Amino acid sequence: MVNVEDRLYEGIAQQAGIAGCTLVDARMVRTGRAVALQVFIEKDETTAVTIEDCAAVSRQLSLWLDVENPIHGAYRLEVSSPGLDRPLKNLHDFERFKGSQAEIHLHGLTQGRRRLQGELLGVEDQKIVLKNAEGRWTFALDDIHKARLVPQW
């Protein structure tokens, strides 16, 4: 997986906003020789993303990408909702999904652990708080490599 550069990410976020949605995440994914720009959007915290929302963002992004040409080479544009296992990207996400199960991958080891799963307790003093059977854990956002919700069935 290749990170989307900050400037490109900001442009994608702006175009999603013009189409009435909020950018959750964007990434370039390579599978063999094919490259896809995957864009994950949400409408707002209470409204589900529809196929029409995805189409509107796709149209808006396609126009912008054609004009700005920020990606060199061929790629496929994919726009969708983030799904039940949505990524958690900022402090607002960690607070918003307080009470949910989450999986957190850290950049380095914390008490011998690089990956933790448990219940999100929210954000306290700009630190993310997670609770599991082993105890209570706190992390700075910068300590987290990636985080996602874990769907409960």
Curated annotation (Swiss-Prot):
Protein's UniProt keywords contain Cytoplasm: yes
GO cellular component: cytosol
Source superkingdom: Bacteria
Main location class: cytoplasm
Subcellular location: Cytoplasm
Keywords associated with the record: Cytoplasm, Ribosome biogenesis
Record carries keyword Cytoplasm: yes
Annotated GO biological process: ribosomal small subunit assembly; translation
InterPro entries, per the entry: Ribosome_maturation_RimP, RimP_C, RimP_C_sf, RimP_N, RimP_N_sf
Protein family: Belongs to the RimP family.
General function of this protein: Required for maturation of 30S ribosomal subunits.
The name this protein goes by in its record: Ribosome maturation factor RimP
